[in-house]
Amino acid sequence: MPVTSAGLLFHRRTDGRLAVLLAHMGGPFWARREVGAWTILKGEVGADEDAHTAAVREAAEELGVPLPTETVPDLDLGEVRQRSGKRVRAWARRWPPPGPDPEAVRSNTVRIEWPPRSGRHVDVPEIDRVAWFSPDEARRVVVRGQADLVDRLERALDDPAAAT
């Protein structure tokens, strides 16, 4: 059965231009990669957990800084399927400028086996940095299966009835 994750795609406008916040995946496998190494803030939904609640929890855990208050309901971007088969349910939330201080972001850690099949385990941050991207640049660097979320956000901001 495919894993289901839930996440938040934060967005802001600066000088009238849309930007989205993406996180660079942590750990040695992703250290020197850019294209396909960025993701929305997301994580697995617990067995008895509401997907939106999981999305907010995961974003807070991965950023390690207070999230902006939901002043209007988060925008439901629907679900996408990544190449791995993982399903990602996402919402968008506006983050008023300037957004999180990248230096203040402190992700939680996960334990991985590294190098693979070595029997050795190391703790690595789930994400090692965050950055704001234009929609075009976001589509270039984000995990391929999540690019449609950026498209849906743009459509929804142009026409709120068009999100999913």
Predicted regions mapped to residue ranges:
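Active-site-adjacent beta-strand/loop module that shapes the phosphate/pyrophosphate-binding cleft
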Residues: 79-119, 131, 153
